[in-house]
Amino acid sequence: MSNIKRMAIVLVAVALVALVASSFKGSDVLDRSIILGVGVDAFGDYGIQLTVEVVSPGNGSEQVGTFSKTVTVEAKTISQDIQNVAEYTGKEASLGQCVVLILGQDYYENVDFTDLIEYFINHHSLKESTAICCCEGSAKDLLNNGGALAQSVSLAIATAMLDQTEKIAVSTNNLLKYTRSQNELDCTGFLNKVTFVPSENKDAQDSDKVMGYFTYRELAVFRGNRYVCDLNEEEVRGMSLFVEDVVGETFVSYQDEYKRTLQVNNKDVEQKRTDNGGFDITITISVRFGRTDSEEVSGILSSKKNDEIDPKLLDDVQQQAMQLATAFLAKQAEYNFDLLKFHESYRQKQGTSDQLAHKPTADFPVNLTIKVEEN
């Protein structure tokens, strides 16, 4: 390699280092508390306990690899809490890099949190794409746990929620989508319910910190920012069948005494209004065998993608899918919420009216058809 090329590489490397360094100059990390995640819990009578995960770069006096720390404050309003974070840390609290907002169970089950949502959606620096969820137990405890890979809890949860739709076949939400749902005719929306599952692993730097992983298999339903009910795993799977861009769902069936796993890799959902004030809904899902694709291992475990699927397996998947979808529809009718936007669909046709706004979800008859085909 010529000296000129070597010099060019050195200059490029120096430029990259300078660019990265400039993005973390004193006005950022040193002068501001960069918040990665926000947890909200109930505090006293109508108060709010706020727990934030803030960036904490390691230095000579800290443990090697320290990435973030949590700060907990209490106040009567969310704006006072944010001010208290600034006073506690001695730095301006910055929400520009916040990736997740978590509502604790005692808070979201008992409080109309409209003011909280309005504060965050109108905050000039918080991104509308910020993930929003709720959790089992307190948000403070959740943020003080350790993820399976010992990374930031906020980043771990936000990353999982961004990947849920494509990889784990569960609908997810962000701040903008949730806020819009609460301003539609039926004011119905949902939040993913995060649960921490402890493991026997220990943090090498903090032996007292509980390590584990997070699950997202349940949802909490809200109307007008007030809690309605939870959806269990079966009902969540049923709801996801109605969402066209949610794929990856797996079904297990038996063939010749062997378990066979079929995975949904394509879906078409057609929802039409009917003359009797209801809906005809047709869900067509395409499936294929779900197997490990390990062609790089000399073909020993390579996926046989051309295997034909026995029609009996397709029938079994259809029955399972119908059971899941029916369970969700029954829950929606029982608790009178509308995640399938039945009210909004008829509002677009008939216009807004008090009669439509107060129409029970159970009064929309649904004719459901599910088709399963091999991809």
Predicted regions span which residues?
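Membrane-proximal alpha-helical signals and transmembrane carboxylates
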Residues: 2-375
